[in-house]
Amino acid sequence: MTGKEIRARFLKFFADRGHAVVPSSPLIPHNDPTLLFANAGMNQFKDCFLGLEKRDYVRACSSQKCVRAGGKHNDLENVGRTARHHTFFEMLGNFSFGDYFKKEAIAFAWEFLTKDLGLDKDRLYVTVYTDDDEAADIWHLQEGVPRERIYRFGEKDNFWAMGDTGPCGPCSEIFWDNGPEVGCGSPDCAVGCDCDRYMEIWNNVFMQFNRSADGVLTPLPKPSVDTGMGLERISTVMQGVKSNYDTDLFQGIIGHVEKLSGKRYRHSEKDDVSMRVMADHVRATTFLICDGVLPSNEGRGYVLRRIMRRAARHAKMLGFAEPVICRMVEAVNAMMGDAYPELLEREEYIRKVIRAEEERFAETLDRGLAILNEAVADLKNEGRTVIPGETLFRLYDTFGFPTDLTADIVRSEGFTIDEDGFEACMERQREQAREHWKGSGEEGIAEVHKTLHSRGVRSRFTGYEARTAYSPVTVLLKGGAEVAEATAGDRVEIITDATPFYGESGGQVGDTGTISTGSAHVEVTETLRPFPDLIVHRGTVVEGTIRQGDACDLKVAPGRDATARNHTATHLLQSALRQVLGDHVKQSGSLVGPDRLRFDFTHFAAMTPEEIRRVEEIVNSCIMANDDVHAREMALDEAMEIGATALFGEKYGDTVRVVRVGEVSMELCGGTHVHAAGDIGFFKILSEAGIAAGVRRIEALTGMGALRHVQQLEDERKEIAALIKAEGGDNVERLQRLLTRQKDMQREIETLESRLNAARSADLLADVREVNGVKVLATLAEVDDPKKLRELADTLKDRLGSGVVALGCVKEGKANLLVAVTKDLTGRVKAGDLIRQLSPIIGGSGGGKPELAQAGGTLPDKLGEALGKVCELVP
């Protein structure tokens, strides 16, 4: 039975028993930034189990995409070396949200395995929690499992909890006996042994308690069920093989590697490991990229990069010199495309992302391996077997080697890595970054904000409707402490009951403006929003005395209009980018201010000039269409259902604000916007550049700022035309003629300099001396550039045939010294050794290779002395 058939049978079995078939959630957990990747079937139902969400079904089943390659569940180093470890896998599961419980869950599992799949009952064993007599009795009395085939284990193995507190309960697992031939051979071998004989294939979690902070277990009013069965494992059972990699889920991909490499699987254990690593990792890579992850140096993107680079390294071990992981995507899609059609829709994009990362890593892989091999050799000579943290950090920081990749490489040499030392180096780097950033006490003030918020201090934002408000001062802060009053010159923070000022959040800068009372005037230079319902105005009292409790007039500065233009334009920009580049474009960050907008987005390559122009045309077409901009609040689920764009990893509340621009853009957003797209006026992109692997940044202008930019470009064009004496707008043609002429003149200069060098060398060769059988020329040269000094030395070496050339020159009051040695003499005399002995004489330092070395110094009048020393130093 194939993996596809098992998946289909499982879902049909439970659908026939009243379960809703729920599609797999994306690997990036929606609305749960605490979870790196979906790693279990229950992830998407977490709020259902917690009682925070109600759906229109109380029992469900799914086949969930899962990745375990970071944090608590990190199987990466074992992948390819064992029969069971994977980065990507599918978890089949059935779930009950306060509906059925132990009796039904056990009955469903046993029926599916023994009747639907037809497994031999005599090769099945079950486990229960040590105190769960109820489950043990159900297994024995209801399903007829003999008592001797029911094992009891403690909390470590058979009790599940969502966290230190909250829902929890006992587990009951089902094991398959692979037979004594794959066991450890011990007479005591039984369920619970670490060998491969008894393999867990199904786990039933019975959530029946709530654990309090003091550890007390209280029965839940509506207990639930969470189950999981790995598709890869049950496939080994149904296909009669001992390794997950021998199932059809992997064999098609491994066969593709065989075809591409010309090597056979099962002919070499070393090659087999590499093929298994590549097969597993390309599955994880394909699904992660499809779900919106791109390789980077942090978070989810870094996990993906680690997986991809480990696969690329094993591809190199198999003999691949060109990118190959990208060529394996079609094999993954051939196996998985039916169940996950999004893979087929995005196949070309996935291949491009993988190829770009493979090419990027290839640029540094060989150099990094050379450094690592050198370190291993040195450590072996010293009798050490641990790669130091400093070496790990250099490989990571300079050559892009994740630490687990380094560990994987040196494992065969019997080496381990100093992870603590690496973390210490990383922390030093973080500390240096912190030192370079000079804060202004925000962290201390933030504690004040937390205290105020816990006291119930709140602000009501009225700025969507108005730019002014009249409200009392509820809190006055100075120096991070609450005060009763503040006078002229004081830097203060003011909290009012209501405010039209937008607090910095969602990428939009905070408003500026004024706060006035009958006796005081405050210039607001910054507005913060430490909590969604708390807005803090930061500024300076420029006149009078302001007191807590004073009624005040709040007025937002006109810059808000420009910020609103830029914010709405940012929404249109994201929509246009998705139209031009593809649906893989996701927001990675943004900054919206009154002067410009900045938008960071996921994309694997620099945009072409044509793509940039197309994006500008789309945005400006929307502006000219003058579509209305509407904003309304709705439930998060409703917003997702109507297709509103959300920011990946952002934690949203139950109610969200959706901003819609005609039929072009619809996003979750709490920022301020124009009333109609035409209010933006004009949109112009200033720049597009990469800021990280797989992340691009666009900076743009709108309104009068965009117009002034175009006017400035026009002024510069006219100025250039005047300088180059271009007429009739033929700037480009005129410039091309000037550049061609410049190149011709440069070639003439180089020809003349070559002739001059030949003449100089003829004169200088008269000063050649023979020292111990070696021809030596040491002299000052009439050149004013170290580059020309090198060219002259090359000419002299050629003319000498064999010998040592030492030349000196002065440029801008500094001494320059060069030593060149012909290749036949480097075994006897080295240029680098000579320059190190000569450079102190001219008040400097230098170095180089055996054939060529240079030095610079601050004592040009000592050049003659240094050159006179050369003959003494030639052995």
Curated annotation (Swiss-Prot):
The keyword Protein biosynthesis applies. It is found in: Cytoplasm. CDD domains: AlaRS_core. InterPro entries: aa-tRNA-synth_II/BPL/LPL (IPR045864), Ala-tRNA-lgiase_IIc (IPR002318), Ala-tRNA-ligase_IIc_anticod-bd (IPR018162), Ala-tRNA-synth_IIc_core (IPR018165), Ala-tRNA-synth_IIc_N (IPR018164), Ala-tRNA_ligase (IPR050058), Ala_tRNA_ligase_euk/bac (IPR023033), DHHA1_dom (IPR003156). One of its GO terms (molecular function) is ATP binding. Its EC number is 6.1.1.7. One of its GO terms (cellular component) is cytosol. It catalyses: tRNA(Ala) + L-alanine + ATP = L-alanyl-tRNA(Ala) + AMP + diphosphate. Keywords: Aminoacyl-tRNA synthetase, ATP-binding, Cytoplasm, Ligase, Metal-binding, Nucleotide-binding, Protein biosynthesis, RNA-binding, tRNA-binding, Zinc. Zn(2+) binds at H567, H571, C669, H673. SMART domains: tRNA_SAD. The keyword Metal-binding applies. Its main location: cytoplasm. One of its GO terms (biological process) is negative regulation of DNA-templated transcription. Consists of three domains; the N-terminal catalytic domain, the editing domain and the C-terminal C-Ala domain. The editing domain removes incorrectly charged amino acids, while the C-Ala domain, along with tRNA(Ala), serves as a bridge to cooperatively bring together the editing and aminoacylation centers thus stimulating deacylation of misacylated tRNAs. PANTHER family: ALANINE--TRNA LIGASE, CYTOPLASMIC (PTHR11777:SF9), ALANYL-TRNA SYNTHETASE (PTHR11777). This is Alanine--tRNA ligase.
